[in-house]
């Protein structure tokens, strides 16, 4: 007798469908909070599976990168070409506390800057802030016509490009190493570093459209909860409740 499965017995009833489980029923929504340096604090929402067994929901949320337009963060449509990256560092209840992770330009903005008859000057440098963040900053600039210039082209010589690039290195290093990450991010929005480069390069060759087009965090210091809360405006100096100086312990009663 052949040993094997009985095909007649193994067949189940036809028409029985498996119970469909909605995957969203096992997930929770979390609010993403931006640092206090931005005008809008509620960035959006994100999903995560509920904590189950050894799997913690917080572990799946920490380290997530969120990309937001600066126009949405500061309610300024003129800054829509800047993209800000935020990293989730801590979870408090249903709130995800984020920190700055990077900045970049949109591709359409970069393409609109590149034109004919001018020289493109680029530079990048690694800098370290006072609070221990190692960043790589990318600067970009374009030559423009001198006052009362008749010639259509504004090409700079290679020696002039090297001099301008050297100025870019010096200014980006100086501006970044003398402040912490929070102050550096605040310099990106009004383009304070770009204006400094434009002013310094005026004696070499006049520039236009000078920007720090990209900032990338290469290395972060050890995570500090108090600094993150300070960045979100939730920290307090008082760690406990104060007790009155003239406090006296009650006397021990002999009988109750």
Swiss-Prot record:
Keywords: Acetylation, Cytoplasm, Ribonucleoprotein, Ribosomal protein. The keyword Oxidoreductase does not apply. One of its GO terms (molecular function) is structural constituent of ribosome. The modification N-acetylalanine is found at residue 2. It is found in: Cytoplasm. PROSITE patterns: RIBOSOMAL_S3AE. GO terms for biological process: translation. The keyword Acetylation applies. GO terms for cellular component: cytosolic small ribosomal subunit. Its main location: cytoplasm. Component of the small ribosomal subunit. Mature ribosomes consist of a small (40S) and a large (60S) subunit. The 40S subunit contains about 33 different proteins and 1 molecule of RNA (18S). The 60S subunit contains about 49 different proteins and 3 molecules of RNA (25S, 5.8S and 5S). Belongs to the eukaryotic ribosomal protein eS1 family. This is Small ribosomal subunit protein eS1. It comes from Laccaria bicolor (strain S238N-H82 / ATCC MYA-4686) (Bicoloured deceiver).
